[in-house]
Amino acid sequence: MKDDKEKALSAALAQIERQFGKGSIMKLGDNTTMDVETISTGSLGLDIALGAGGLPMGRVVEIYGPESSGKTTLTLEVIAEAQRNGKVCAFIDAEHALDPVYAEKLGVNIDELLISQPDTGEQALEIVDMLTRSGAIDVIVVDSVAALTPKAEIEGDMGDSHMGLQARMLSQAMRKLTGNLKKSNTMLIFINQIRMKIGVMFGSPETTTGGNALKFYASVRLDIRRIGAVKNGDEIVGNETRVKVVKNKIAPPFKQAEFQILYGEGINNLGELIELGVKHEFVEKAGAWYSCNGERIGQGKANAAKYLDEHPEMAKDVDTKLRDMFLSKTVVAEDKSEVKEKEKA
């Protein structure tokens, strides 16, 4: 009886693969893509909080927060990191507000970055779908969901009511996009804004635009907030930023990271590296002096960060030690033939 069932299952699997292509159905243990490929966010603390070393490829990511909290800066850092790894990126600028000079300062190669400034929300999402189906794009950023205005709203009069139009448009787009994103291994990042619900007595009155579909389809949701100012004397030179991982399908959620975003420079990753290094004893601190591997690297955090900037191999060493300590990567399932050969050896 058991043999009959196995034969019937094998025949069904063979028919499914013939009809829908190889890999359309498989046993979960045979899946060689169990280990999710990630791209660093530019912040070591946030990579650790995400649990996988960065944002996942082939998934939908939502980054939301108040105005001037660092949403676009964070996505530009991801794009810069992706480009350094030879990946192709696109920026759908629905807000028509991307500053190429600032993007270049953050390390983005603007000569290679694809940019689109669509007229309507439908056009923006259609462009995203076409880029995804091409299989040639690795990272797409949509800035922002709130600016994805439905065509009917643009063509209508100013006082017209368009209840639920944007939510319906996004819900349909999500249904179309998620399968294609997985197949082409493309990361899609949506930047979103915060709105207030009226008449909320208990719980948070905050909500994001575009309905509930994006909340469900996103594998990672990040809540980014400005929590203070970075000062050099009396001059404000940046923001203290906190990011909460509100939803995470690839690792445990609800972790958070704090880092500095410096004006004109982006995430202060070297300062963060020193703080985490001291906390976990990869960098020694005696008074105001910082040392690494028995070598003094500077008096004060700013000088120590400058030293690491001039000695990238030392910064890389501390970064690697911290990542090895926190990020235990899932081992990719190997091809069975390779496993058998190893067992014989």
From Swiss-Prot:
UniProt keyword Glycoprotein present: no
Family of the protein in this entry: Belongs to the RecA family.
Functional note: Can catalyze the hydrolysis of ATP in the presence of single-stranded DNA, the ATP-dependent uptake of single-stranded DNA by duplex DNA, and the ATP-dependent hybridization of homologous single-stranded DNAs. It interacts with LexA causing its activation and leading to its autocatalytic cleavage.
BP term (GO), one: DNA recombination
Record keyword Nucleus present: no
SMART domains, per the entry: AAA (SM00382)
Record-level Gene Ontology MF annotations: ATP binding; ATP hydrolysis activity; ATP-dependent DNA damage sensor activity; damaged DNA binding; single-stranded DNA binding
Full protein name: Protein RecA
Record Pfam families: RecA (PF00154), RecA_C (PF21096)
One term under GO cellular component: cytosol
InterPro entries, A to Z: AAA+_ATPase, DNA_recomb/repair_RecA, DNA_recomb/repair_RecA_CS, P-loop_NTPase, RecA-like_C, RecA-like_N, RecA_ATP-bd, RecA_C_sf
Key words, A-Z: ATP-binding, Cytoplasm, DNA damage, DNA recombination, DNA repair, DNA-binding, Nucleotide-binding, SOS response
Subcellular location: Cytoplasm
Superkingdom of the source species: Bacteria
Residues reported to bind ATP: 65-72
